Amino acid sequence: MCDIVRCRRSQLIRGHVLARLCHGIASPLLGRLRPRRPNGCPRRRGRQTYTRFQTLELEKEFHFNHYLTRRRRIEIAHALCLTERQIKIWFQNRRMKLKKELRAVKEINEQARREREEQDKMKNDSLKSAQQHHQSQKQQQQEHTVVGSQQTSGGGGGGSTSLGSHLHHPSIVAQNDLKLGLGSMGVGVGGNLSMMGGLDNKTNQDILKAVSNVHS
């Protein structure tokens, strides 16, 4: 009986030693058999893929909560047949994606604001230039009007002076014309009184009186 026990014990010891030896030899071999990258590092696990249903449920949860508690993470993992680590990684990636989206929206809004400010500035500059051009045209028109009125007033003054010299004392000119006409008329009357015999005395007296007044 003792021999049997000793034999059994020795077999167990030998088996244990052989197992350890085999494990020590196999471990490096298994490490060598693992796929490695060109730089010698072991290849990482493939990216986790999520089904359409899982992605939809995770998006719904992320819409309400960007951060999950441990309890809620475990519940979602059981409901979607995922591990807790997968849920945690998905939410981390989703938060990073949200930050990038917000940053992109902010940059777009900033660019739109700058473009709008530039357009407003260009519009204001064009309005100012148009106003200045209009004011300069108006000022030039006023200057031309003033110069034209001055020239007109100067020419009119000279013309009025010359016209005044020609038309000075119209009563005197009329009297001179009347003297000339009546003088010749008086000569004719004085020389030909016999021809005026047919006229009445009153008319002759009026004519003679007018002639005498003119000569005087």
Curated annotation (Swiss-Prot):
Q: Which UniProt keywords apply?
A: Developmental protein, DNA-binding, Homeobox, Nucleus
Q: What does this protein do?
A: Sequence-specific transcription factor which is part of a developmental regulatory system that provides cells with specific positional identities on the anterior-posterior axis.
Q: Where is the composition biased (Basic and acidic residues)?
A: 112-126
One GO BP on record is: anterior/posterior pattern specification
Its recorded name reads Homeobox protein abdominal-A homolog
Source organism per entry reads Culex quinquefasciatus
Give yes or no: UniProt keyword DNA-binding.
yes
Source organism, top-level taxon: Eukaryota
